[in-house]
């Protein structure tokens, strides 16, 4: 995956090129495309045409940050920057950039409004680059997918073990808190070779309705018989290049789930299934969604 894939995608979609813009680290896509880390203090534009070699437009001050300067246009002031852009983009009508119309996808909306004005002022039609980036840099390799699936299997087993342990304690009338269950689950995940950026969430009853809830040793509800319990856990294999898995499950600490609880669970489950079916149908049809 890389620039050749990006150019192939651009040609297939009839887009003239991809303009990656960054100002002092505002767009992480640039570092991914160029590779490595650089200390850049001025505006940088990396033009990837559908056909031909890419061109870098950067300040002369930052010239030393780039080892390969063969395709570089250095500018010294704003007017020369605009001139360089105008020259580099000559002949292009449709330009993909990191922006999302209406702010619909903020993760890939990295270009400020003024820069969009600048490119449009050069007579270009700006279109979103999200699909370009995903196709060229965000598809999983077979090895990466294997790490994701292995992590998912470990998480699934850890989840089952935690529910069984917690409900056994609760039904027997023995005291166990959200935090204690969380710590047991986190240790099991680590013992199975997973790494994570935050400990899993174990939330009972109304706490399960707070998306940002996390139990602490000081503030943690006791899990009792007939309680509703949510477990949200994520992790990846503790090795380079591994990919996260993330699951959320709910359970009921009783012999029979109340009708209202089941009704809510069924609604969420059916919504999940409908979303997956929509994505599968779109993928089979080669349709973006």
Each model region followed by its residue ranges:
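Active-site neighborhoods and metal-handling regions in enzymes and metal-associated proteins
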Residues: 1-289
């Amino acid at each position: 995956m890389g620039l050749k894939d990006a150019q192939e995608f651009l040609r297939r979609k009839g887009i003239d090129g991809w303009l990656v813009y960054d100002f002092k680290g505002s767009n992480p896509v640039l570092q991914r495309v160029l590779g490595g880390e650089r200390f850049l203090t001025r505006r940088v534009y990396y033009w990837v045409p559908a056909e031909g070699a890419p061109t870098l437009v950067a300040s002369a001050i930052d010239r030393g940050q780039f080892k390969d300067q063969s395709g570089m246009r250095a500018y010294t002031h704003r007017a020369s920057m605009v001139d360089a852009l105008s020259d580099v983009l000559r002949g292009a009508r449709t330009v993909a950039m990191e922006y999302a119309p209406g702010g619909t996808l903020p993760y890939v909306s990295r270009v400020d409004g003024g820069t969009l004005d600048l490119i449009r002022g050069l007579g270009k039609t700006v279109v979103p680059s999200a699909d370009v980036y995903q196709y060229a840099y965000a598809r999983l390799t077979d090895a990466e997918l294997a790490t994701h699936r292995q992590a998912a299997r470990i998480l699934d087993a850890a989840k089952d073990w935690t529910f069984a342990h917690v409900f056994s304690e609760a039904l027997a009338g023995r005291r166990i808190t959200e935090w204690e269950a969380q710590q047991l689950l986190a240790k099991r995940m680590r013992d199975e070779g997973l790494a994570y950026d935050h400990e899993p969430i174990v939330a009972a009853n109304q706490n399960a309705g707070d998306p940002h809830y996390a139990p602490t040793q000081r503030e943690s509800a006791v899990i009792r018989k007939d309680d509703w319990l949510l477990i949200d856990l994520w992790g990846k294999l503790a090795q380079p290049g591994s990919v996260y898995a993330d699951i959320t499950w709910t359970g009921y600490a009783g012999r029979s789930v109340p009708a209202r609880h089941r009704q809510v669970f069924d609604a969420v489950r059916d919504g999940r299934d409908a979303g997956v079916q929509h994505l599968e149908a779109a993928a089979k049809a080669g349709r973006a969604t």
